A protein has these predicted regions:
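Active-site beta->alpha loop and helix N-cap motifs at the rims of alpha/beta catalytic domains
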Residues: 2-152, 157
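Basic phosphate/pyrophosphate-binding loop/patch that engages nucleotide-derived ligands
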Residues: 162
Length: 162
């Protein structure tokens, strides 16, 4: 994987929950209050659209709305990592490009996953992350999430970091 950035991030980057109203619709004013609270409480950065943020229950339009609304509101006060996970390489790369264009400092991506019984081998995992990396100029945080069902060996992670 190519080196994308010399920026060094450190400190606390909590996952921002997605705020919904009583009808299950996005509550953007509530979302921005939550973001402000996390920044005012001393967060060094934020991570949006992660598993805890209910990313899998959001439509693409809702993801885009949250990404642009939050990044515009944060306006560089802290770095924001945007989760762009998708099992399809093309979709993940496009989500990552859009996150970069909106101002994300980094994207967080789970390995490709295809349900409970279909596993992607290490060559496929490497190709997936290489394609996403080639699509953007910001770093990728690889999320080793057990929910994906795709294990990432220490050796694979170390080799991709080089």
């Amino acid at each position: 994987m190519s080196q994308k950035s010399t920026a060094r991030y450190q400190g606390v980057f909590p996952v921002v929950p997605t705020i919904f109203d009583s009808q299950g619709e996005l509550d953007l004013p509530g979302q921005l209050r939550c973001v402000d609270f996390m920044i005012d409480a001393g967060s060094n950065g934020l991570c949006i659209l992660a598993n805890f943020s209910e990313q899998f229950s959001l439509s693409d339009a809702e993801r885009e709305t949250l990404t642009t609304t939050i990044l515009d509101h944060v306006a560089g006060r802290v770095p924001v990592i945007v989760t762009t996970t998708h099992y399809g390489t093309r979709v993940c790369a496009e989500r990552s490009r859009r996150a970069q264009q909106a101002g994300a400092c980094m994207v967080m991506v789970m390995p490709p996953y295809h349900g409970a019984t279909i596993r992607v081998g290490e060559p496929g995992i490497r190709a997936f992350f290489q394609a996403v990396s080639d699509a953007i100029d910001i770093p990728i945080m690889i999320q080793d999430a057990p929910v994906s069902g795709t294990p990432l060996s220490v050796a694979l992670l170390a080799s991709m970091a080089k």
